[in-house]
Amino acid sequence: GESYFFEESINKVLEGMRLRSVIEKIHYANLENKIASSKYKTYSGRIRGDHFFGIYLPIEGTTSSFDIQIQGNQYRHKVNFSIEDKGKLGDLERICEIIKEKTCLYNFNLEDNSILEKSSSRKKWKTYGKQDYYDYARIKKQVSSKDLIVYIRTDVKKIKADLQKVKNIFLENIKSTTK
C-alpha cells in the first residue's frame, strides 16, 4: 500500500515547487477521513509548520479528554487535563504514572510491533501549558498508511475500553476539599 512517509527525494521536489505543505495537509486530511467515525471525533491541523491529525476521546464523568495524535513520525498518547480537573488533581505527572500502570494508555507494547518503535529522544512527559501530558513512540519508516490506520482503530478500541478506569483514577485522586 501507499507509504505513510514520503520519500526524501519526493520531499525535496515538493519543497522546490513550494508544494510540500499543501501535499502534507492533503495527506493528513486523507488519513483523518479514513479514520473518522460517528463513534469519535477526529481533527487535523498544523502547528509550527508541521501537520498533524488526531482522535479525541472524552473521559466521561470528567472535563478532561484523551487523544491519539500523529505528527510526523510521532505516535502520541495524550491526556488533556482540563483546568478544573488540574486544580483538583494536584500532581499530574503522578496521575499519568498511575494511568500508565493501570491502563493501556501511554503503553505502546513495542515488542513484536510492526508499526511503532521506541523513540530515542523520548522525554517522560511533554506538557503544553502544563495541561496536556503526552508520551510517544516513533512510527517505523516502512509503514503503509493502511496498516497505520488499522493499528489506530485497534488502539482506539483498547483505549475506549480503559477510559472508565481513567475516570476512576481521577475520582480516587481528587484532593479532598474538606479541612
Question: Which stretches of residues belong to each language-model region?
Answer:
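Long, solvent-exposed, polar/charged low-complexity segments
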Residues: 12, 16, 20-21, 136-179
